[in-house]
Amino acid sequence: MLGKDYMLAIILVNCDDDLWGDQNLEGETGLPPGWRKIRDAAGTYYWHVPSGSTQWQRPTWELAEDPGTGKEGIWELRPPKGRSFSSLDSSLNRSNSLTWYNEDSYVRSLEPGAKCFAVRSLGWVEVPEEDLAPGKSSIAVNNCIQQLAQARNRSQPHDGAWGEGQNMLMVLKKDAMSLLNPLDHSLIHCQPLVHIRVWGVGSSKGRDRDFAFVAGDKDSCMLKCHVFRCDVPAKAIASRLQGLCAQILSERVGLSGEAACCSPDPISPEDFPRQVELLDAVSQAAQKYEALYMGILPVTKAMGMDVLNEAIGTLTGRGDRKTWVPAMLSVSDSLMTAHPIQAEAGAEEEPLWQCPVRLVTFIGVGHDPHTFGLIADLGCQSFQCAAFWCQPHAGGLSEAVQAACMVQYQKCLVASAARGKAWGAQARARLRLKRTSSMDSPGGPLPPPLLKGGVGGAGAAPRKRGVFSFLDAFRLKPLFSICPKLILEGWGKRLYTLPVPRVL
């Protein structure tokens, strides 16, 4: 038997009549603005129309002064004890409640590793291709979140959005994001993960439950940013999505390395997630940023926002901004270099600071959104932090360095798979030579060089062990092990976490 809360939800969702004109919905006098009184078979309850929340208790006015003074009253929306129609109230995490349309059994029937999240679609906004460049993508995504959230609050829906304003179940599984109807679990939309270009989480006040992703629409041939309001902090969805993309990348690289001995075709960029391909294309040329070079400082650990903030604070306290050196920071996919701006024209002067991208272990934006720092591994358990002061903020520089790290990691994976392919081609050549020798000399032994390096000989094992131990090293370690802080919006108020791969 369904509980009262769930019965209310079913009645409202399946009601075909005009709810506003229904005689059971009463705009009773004395209720705070936005509240309606509803009577049905489940009983009498109160519905807050703007938020969709319901409660059994009659909402009350809380007067700032005595009611007899005639001053305007102030009302407060107290936490409802009933079911919220605007959300599923973390229904997937309930342990002691009744099922709603076999919801719990559906969750149990999902494939291992799949995760469900209760969301509501706010619609989509078209995004130009140029807005997805490093330094711009986070701003573009956050603008989409703000635009759709504000439009939704003004009850001005964006035309053409599938499922807009509808409660959904977002199911993240191995290779796709599925959006389902929470009542009958019918499929509303299926989005392959490899086609998702960018995703993000709102960071301004009240937007930490807004999640957005950008993907191409095959019908309209445009990039669309889809925005959702979540019942849980949206970072949970972003983290799960990041883990699935990392898993796809590692599996494809592993398969490419093992299948190289069977396929003569070179590794195609299509074998890797689209997000990494974009970073590779963007980072072909060095990007330059003006910043104040604050200096370097030895640190004790390779990663950690606390370590980075402490180092930035120490460098900030050593002197005021006048003592910092104006520099032009050049960021490529392999090297970062800071030159004094006064000496930019003359290439003879030594750079202020230089660091290969492969040595970077951690990046982040400090408490002051103008400050950016990174930690580099110098070897022998020695780590160094370099800090810069940026204007108007450090978001563009942080995204450029993140992109360089991911491109460097992609190149490392491609190189490892290419080495596996080269080993497979060499093994096939030896196998053909072995067969030819066997036909020409049925009873004769193979030449000593082939015995030493032939298939199954002593020479093949070290190569095979070397390739697979290299791949296993990445499988044993988290694919994205660094978590720098990158800002979407609200500088100095909230830091948004994005992972950056470490290149060994």
Curated annotation (Swiss-Prot):
InterPro entries for this protein: APBB1/2/3 (IPR039576), PH-like_dom_sf (IPR011993), PTB/PI_dom (IPR006020), WW_dom (IPR001202), WW_dom_sf (IPR036020)
Cross-referenced SUPFAM superfamilies: PH domain-like, WW domain
GO biological process, one term: regulation of DNA-templated transcription
Pfam family, one: WW
Domain WW residue range list: 29-61
Coiled-coil boundaries: none
Annotated PID domain residues: 111-278, 283-438
Keywords from the named record: Cytoplasm, Nucleus, Repeat
GO cellular component, one term: nucleus
Organs and tissues of expression: Expressed predominantly in brain and testis.
Organism domain of life: Eukaryota
Localisation: Cytoplasm; Nucleus
UniProt-recorded Gene Ontology molecular function terms: amyloid-beta binding; low-density lipoprotein particle receptor binding; molecular adaptor activity
Function per UniProt: May modulate the internalization of amyloid-beta precursor protein.
PANTHER family in alphabetical order: AMYLOID BETA A4 PRECURSOR PROTEIN-BINDING FAMILY B, AMYLOID-BETA A4 PRECURSOR PROTEIN-BINDING FAMILY B MEMBER 3
Oligomer status and interactors: Interacts with APP (via intracellular domain). Interacts with APLP1 and APLP2 (via intracellular domain).
Protein name listed in UniProt: Amyloid-beta A4 precursor protein-binding family B member 3
Lineage, broadest ranks: Eukaryota, Metazoa, Chordata, Craniata, Vertebrata
This protein's encoding gene: Apbb3
